[in-house]
Amino acid sequence: MAGDGVNLAVDLAGTRYRFADLAAVMAAASPYRSGDVLAGIAARDATERVSARYILADLPLRTFLSHVPVPYETDEVTRLIVDRHDADAFATIAPLTVGGFREWLLADDTDGATIAAVSAGIMPEMAAAVSKLCRNQDLIAIAAKIRVVTRFRSTMGLAGTLAVRLQPNHPTDDPAGIAASALDGLLMGCGDAMIGINPARDNLAGTIELLHLLDRLRDRYAIPTQSCVLTHITTSIAAIERGAPVDLMFQSIAGSQAANAGFGITLTLLAEGRDAARSLTGGRSAIS
């Protein structure tokens, strides 16, 4: 990669640090995480971490357009990202380095509308790279500029508001236990964001039973919220096909085709799930 004109080396504290590729720089620049250490991709020490951040700060944002982490030819997630990248939106920030992008995001004259205007030109790797150069205070300051407001039965994302998810899980998915836990949480003012159950078992019959339970609870007390049973997307699709009261679709996703395969999903399946959710009627406007 260095032969492509990308600088992946820096001298720091009397030592020259050189990285094999951009992925190695990104990994080493991350804050310390035990999972990265176990995976063998973390920086060896704090100095190497700082050296990776030096390299990242001077890296032009354009680099990420030509050096994707997973090959375009073999990965459908990469193809989705590259094919949807908006060159016109990117033009505003195209001359910047990753470090310059951080300064641009933090600048007083960069407001939420300005960030939204370039958002379609920001690849996930660009966002990940700049976050590695930001302190927590920086991330908070940048995020505070942006408003993402969503509405279903309740509204989330308004300035100065806080919403809470109620999670009435039960070790055996016992409906009575879940109902009792849900009522307890509601009495404490939780659940305005959503009532979401992580089921102990992922099966269609159990999922449908829990969906009806939450729907009856919400309807009986006229609670302005939405519910979700966090099952695999195929289970949720099947529940919709059987007329279950699905409000929200859930699915864990990853950043590569191979990782998504580990979750048992593809982009086609995700699109199918979204279409199923959007097809719901009868007062439901489910979100995928």
Identify the function of each model-found stretch:
Residues 118-119, 123, 130-138, 193-214:
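Glycine-rich, proline-tolerant flexible connector loops at the mouths of alpha/beta enzymes
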Residues 167-171, 198-200, 228-235, 252-256:
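Active-site beta-loop-alpha junctions enriched in small/polar residues
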Residues 177-179, 233-246:
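Catalytic cores of alpha/beta
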Residues 138-144, 150-151, 158-164, 205-232, ...:
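Alpha-helix-loop-beta-strand connector modules within alpha/beta enzyme cores
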Residues 241-288:
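Catalytic alpha/beta core domains of metabolic enzymes, predominantly
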Residues 1-147:
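Long, compositionally biased, glycine/small-hydrophobic-enriched stretches that function as flexible linkers
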Residues 81, 160-178:
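Active-site mouth loops of central-metabolism enzymes
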Residues 185:
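Conserved, mostly hydrophobic/aromatic
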